[in-house]
């Protein structure tokens, strides 16, 4: 896949993880009692790249687990490319980790996004505010996708903590939700990973 800056994939992943760590640290200054656990699903990284990530996360509450492709061979339909299968397996593994290990809010993050330092604090505060106002859990996406403005769909603007949020009816794979919604819609999450 052609990238804007044409650097090796590790450069995007490293910068993404580093910006996420900074955002987590900022969030902890605002919510010192908030328990944040991060799990990285590694899909056969080269040893030198994995070592670089391990140095970055050393001493932080971050685990790395290796993706087991064989676990998903019977679940995921045969795909045109190994990369597509790997992406679906990684996504399924991430959803399973969220389902099995989370307690409250879950934030699924792709490895090529850069995060503003106050991003996580804004999401947690806005989630709490909006979910309280709506009296229900929700899905929250920190990314703004310009292609979502191309059609003329009805939308709502919600006031968050320090930013406004727009309702959408689709997202990619970076979003926050509750464990309750993950469980409630588990079949949908599974179906998302079975085939592309």
Q: Could you tell me what each predicted segment is?
A:
Residues 2-11, 76-83, 190-194:
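Short, flexible/disordered intra-domain loops and linkers
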Residues 4-34:
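Short, acidic, metal-binding catalytic loop of nucleotide-sugar glycosyltransferases
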Residues 30-45, 66-69:
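Short beta-strand/loop segment that forms part of the nucleotide-sugar
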Residues 34-38, 62, 104, 135-139:
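Residue-level recognition of the N-termini of beta-strands and the immediately preceding loop/turn
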Residues 46-103:
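Active-site-proximal specificity loops/subdomain of glycosyltransferases
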Residues 98, 105, 116-189:
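Conserved catalytic core of nucleotide-sugar-dependent glycosyltransferases
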Residues 111-114:
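The conserved acidic donor/metal-binding loop of glycosyltransferases
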């Amino acid at each position: 896949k052609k990238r804007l800056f044409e650097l090796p994939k590790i450069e995007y992943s490293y910068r993404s993880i580093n910006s996420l760590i900074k955002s987590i640290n900022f969030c902890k200054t605002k919510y010192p009692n908030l328990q944040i656990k991060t799990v990285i699903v590694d899909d056969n990284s080269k040893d030198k790249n994995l070592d670089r990530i391990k140095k970055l996360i050393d001493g932080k509450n971050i685990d790395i687990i290796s993706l087991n492709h064989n676990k998903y061979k019977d679940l995921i339909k045969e795909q045109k490319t190994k990369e597509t299968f790997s992406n679906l397996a990684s996504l399924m593994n991430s959803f399973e980790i969220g389902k099995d290990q989370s307690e409250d809010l879950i934030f699924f993050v792709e490895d090529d996004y850069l995060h503003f330092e106050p991003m996580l604090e804004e999401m947690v505060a806005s989630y709490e505010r909006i979910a309280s106002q709506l009296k229900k859990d929700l899905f929250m996406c920190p990314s703004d996708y310009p292609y979502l403005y191309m059609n003329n769909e009805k939308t709502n603007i919600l006031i968050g903590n320090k930013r406004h949020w727009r309702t959408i009816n689709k997202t990619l794979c970076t979003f926050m939700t509750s464990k309750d919604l993950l469980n409630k819609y588990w079949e949908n999450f599974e179906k998302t990973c079975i085939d592309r």
